Amino acid sequence: MPKASASSAKMTASTSNVSSSNSKLKKSKASSPSASPEVSTPSTSNSNDDQDGHVSEDMSDAEEGESQEHSASGSGISDHDDDDDPSADKDSPAADEEQDEKKVATIADDGKKVEFSDLGVIPQIVEACTNMGFKHPTPIQVKAIPEALQARDVIGLAQTGSGKTAAFTIPILQALWDNPKPFFACVLAPTRELAYQISQQVEALGSTIGVRSATIVGGMDMMSQSIALSKRPHVIVATPGRLQDHLENTKGFSLRGLQYLVMDEADRLLDMDFGPIIDKLLQSIPRERRTMLFSATMTTKVAKLQRASLKNPVRVEVDTKYTTVSTLKQHYMFMPFAHKDTYLVHLANEQAGHSIIVFTRTVHDSQRLSILLRLLGFPAIPLHGQLSQQARLGALNKFKTGGRSILVATDVASRGLDIPAVDLVVNYDIPTNSKDYIHRVGRTARAGRSGRSVTLVTQYDVELLQRIEAVIGLKMTEFPGGNDKEAVMLLSERVAEAHRAAVRELKDKGVGSAGGSGKRKRKMDGKYGDDMDRDDDQVQAGLPVSGNGRHQNQNRKKGRR
């Protein structure tokens, strides 16, 4: 936990720059209302070092060069220091402010191609959209942005990959341009990876107006995050548990002047039992604010949260049927359970040079298959909850930049993450929940692009496959080349040898368990031991914590276990 005096001193010192920044804003707007200020490009890290397939090097390689603070300082926006505004109401919306569903407007689809400028977006942000390759707004953006620009609360329902992030980010940035303040907006996300991704989009979309953002998530150093908050960013992107920690323990930090609150992936936020923490957060921010809630589904919990936190919202919907996109080709490969690894290697060999995500059910299989593939010459890297936060970000960065073409991941990567060019999604373990399947395959065929998915089906998985087909409303086809048993079995001896080597490696390092439960057998040594899968956010969400996790988080309040 950061020391209060150090954090307070930093925050006090940072306020001295506010008055000088105000004059810059006036000059910038007076010179040309439509001219774009200097572009401030957010920094990115790139890791290119090689790995040799060993567990310790897999994880340490992934940890390279990732930092938790994202800030893009520019000349476009300066801050009005209104944190101590006495008019800010700290009370949360009363529970009796229920919204009659008949009064919630639903906007119909029109399918019309429009430009961002047609939606009322200012030239500075249109320029940023162009720089990011956004040619036209997506349907959810067409519907949500004009309503949000009119300072209305918004409920957005859209499937994964529909462009929800820009739909709430653009109106916030435009309001910030008109009325720049520190701690102007806060975005809540259910996972750390999604929080970092949102922060990157905020900085990219705000690069032409000099937006500063901070990412506040569990698994990272509290002191460093306190320093980031002392710089008074315009936008905070956070996971609920760690944000609540800072509100309670970081001296000088508050959200009394907050203007915008966004809850992204709200259904998942509530599925992870963050509801009590969100209730506390709502009591720490002004009632007079704009609130946006985005979700893939309108569950009972989401509807309850809507009534408690939004005022007279407009409801915008796009493709609310829970299904896969039409540009996705979905296949299966049928095989004996005993030769599952061999079929996976055969598939990876057939798809060499393509970007592939392999989804597993357990941490053990994620790590084992990553090592197995590396031993056979495939550039694979793992992503799972037992990696440190820096390692998880590093793994994503390597996969996004092409340093590794195969990402072997648990469901930590199945939702919310926008990886631009994923050619193929492989379900090594078929998910038991149809929604999990939809989110997994949603990592490809995004934003109108085409993509493929292949589900590995053994004699034990036929019923699960049929259940998924019933939900998505189509029959999967057999993957071309998947029935060439002779070609597959030629690889069996080498795959079996690589499997034995991978299991020995895992046993030596104590990662996962031979039974595939995915839980740690003992404290991981080296850089593995610095992270706990069940840290701040999971603890506050009421999820179980290992003994090691409690021991390594001595700074956490005892009541949050």
Curated annotation (Swiss-Prot):
The keyword ATP-binding applies. It is an enzyme of class 3 (hydrolase). Its main location: nucleus. A motif (Q motif) lies at residues 114-142. It is found in: Nucleus. It catalyses: ATP + H2O = ADP + phosphate + H(+). Its EC number is 3.6.4.13. It comes from the Eukaryota. A motif (DEAD box) lies at residues 264-267. GO terms for biological process: maturation of SSU-rRNA from tricistronic rRNA transcript (SSU-rRNA, 5.8S rRNA, LSU-rRNA); rRNA processing. CDD domains: DEADc_DDX47, SF2_C_DEAD. Residues 1-23, 30-45 have a biased composition (Low complexity). Keywords: ATP-binding, Coiled coil, Helicase, Hydrolase, Nucleotide-binding, Nucleus, Ribosome biogenesis, RNA-binding, rRNA processing. The keyword Transmembrane helix does not apply. GO terms for cellular component: nucleolus; nucleus; small-subunit processome. It holds the Pfam family DEAD. Residues 100-109 have a biased composition (Basic and acidic residues). InterPro entries: DDX47/Rrp3_DEADc, DEAD/DEAH_box_helicase_dom, DEAD_box_RNA_helicase, Helicase_ATP-bd, Helicase_C-like, P-loop_NTPase, RNA-helicase_DEAD-box_CS, RNA_helicase_DEAD_Q_motif. Interacts with the SSU processome. ATP-dependent rRNA helicase required for pre-ribosomal RNA processing. Involved in the maturation of the 35S-pre-rRNA and to its cleavage to mature 18S rRNA. Belongs to the DEAD box helicase family. DDX47/RRP3 subfamily. The Q motif is unique to and characteristic of the DEAD box family of RNA helicases and controls ATP binding and hydrolysis. This is ATP-dependent rRNA helicase RRP3. It comes from Mycosarcoma maydis (Corn smut fungus).
